[in-house]
Amino acid sequence: ATDYDEEEDDRVKVRLDAR
């Protein structure tokens, strides 16, 4: 991820998946 912490990265990926 970019500009995001490792923990945030997981949430971001999940959000993209839900999309």
From Swiss-Prot:
Coiled coil: none
UniProt modification remark: Conversion of fibrinogen to fibrin is triggered by thrombin, which cleaves fibrinopeptides A and B from alpha and beta chains, and thus exposes the N-terminal polymerization sites responsible for the formation of the soft clot.
GO cellular component term, pick one: extracellular region
Disulfide bonds: none
Sulfotyrosine: modified positions: 4
Swiss-Prot/TrEMBL domain comment: A long coiled coil structure formed by 3 polypeptide chains connects the central nodule to the C-terminal domains (distal nodules). The long C-terminal ends of the alpha chains fold back, contributing a fourth strand to the coiled coil structure.
Reported function: Cleaved by the protease thrombin to yield monomers which, together with fibrinogen alpha (FGA) and fibrinogen gamma (FGG), polymerize to form an insoluble fibrin matrix. Fibrin has a major function in hemostasis as one of the primary components of blood clots. In addition, functions during the early stages of wound repair to stabilize the lesion and guide cell migration during re-epithelialization. Was originally thought to be essential for platelet aggregation, based on in vitro studies using anticoagulated blood.
Quaternary structure and interacting proteins, as annotated: Heterohexamer; disulfide linked. Contains 2 sets of 3 non-identical chains (alpha, beta and gamma). The 2 heterotrimers are in head to head conformation with the N-termini in a small central domain.
Name of the protein in its database record: Fibrinogen beta chain
Organism of provenance: Lama glama
Lineage, broadest ranks: Eukaryota, Metazoa, Chordata, Craniata, Vertebrata
